[in-house]
């Protein structure tokens, strides 16, 4: 064994991986530790699946695309830059996998069931999409429970790029800056996409109001 190998005392057992930050688990995965690979999948398989499922609205397909996403992620961990959040890098890859599929198959379905991080019905309801903005009072008045099939269908008709931004902004609750990092887009482009998406959604939103 090389003299510069990680000392045994500093190498956590599999049960200890859950307490390590993402960057440390990634470092161990880069050393070839299968337990670290499994830990990354354990942490993010559900949120990645939920994100992809919202894009394609097909469970079996979402499972396949989630698997494809993790294959890409684990095969290219050496490209991850530790100054960025691992989750942002991971979601960018998963988002690109879903968008590539949508473009190829021209699918246009989406689910609005709340944040992929939600693990209980209450959490799902609390994180369900809420299209609101201080400058757009019509959207601000909408509550998640009022967003029925008309809104869901309207979002499904958005361009994949707009859809990704809307989902990350209003389902994930991410800032414009985080969306720009996740999707590898200029900040101005993200704001433009969200503005255009809201404009396209407005007729459907107004149609649901009394």
Regions found by a protein language model. Give the residues of each.
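Intrinsic, short, N-terminal disordered tails of RNA polymerase sigma-factor systems
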Residues: 1-27, 31, 39, 110-161, ...
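Sigma70-family region 2
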Residues: 30-31, 57, 70-85, 104-106
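Amphipathic, Lys/Arg- and hydrophobic-enriched alpha-helical face
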Residues: 41-59, 76, 155, 200, ...
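Structural recognition of an alpha-helix C-terminal capping motif at a helix-to-coil junction
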Residues: 50, 64-71, 84-96
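A short pre-motif secondary-structure segment
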Residues: 165-169
């Amino acid at each position: 064994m090389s003299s510069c190998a990680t000392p045994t005392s500093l190498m956590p057992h599999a049960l200890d991986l859950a307490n390590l930050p993402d960057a440390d688990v990634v470092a161990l995965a880069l050393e070839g530790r299968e337990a670290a690979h499994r830990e990354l999948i354990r942490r993010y398989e559900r949120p990645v699946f939920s994100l992809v499922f919202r894009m394609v609205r097909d469970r079996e397909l979402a499972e396949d695309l989630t698997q494809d996403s993790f294959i890409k992620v684990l095969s290219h961990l050496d490209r991850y830059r530790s100054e960025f959040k691992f989750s942002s890098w991971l979601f960018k890859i998963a988002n690109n996998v879903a968008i590539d599929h949508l473009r190829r198959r021209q699918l246009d379905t989406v689910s609005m069931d709340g944040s992929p991080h939600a693990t209980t019905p209450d959490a799902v309801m609390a994180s369900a999409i809420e299209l609101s903005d201080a400058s757009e009072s019509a959207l601000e008045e909408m509550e998640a429970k009022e967003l029925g099939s008309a809104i869901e269908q309207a979002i499904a008709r958005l361009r994949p790029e707009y859809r990704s931004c809307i989902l990350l902004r209003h389902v994930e609750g991410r800032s414009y800056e985080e969306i720009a990092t996740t999707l590898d887009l200029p900040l101005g482009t993200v704001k433009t996409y969200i503005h255009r998406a809201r404009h396209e959604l407005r007729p459907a939103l107004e149609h649901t109001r009394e």
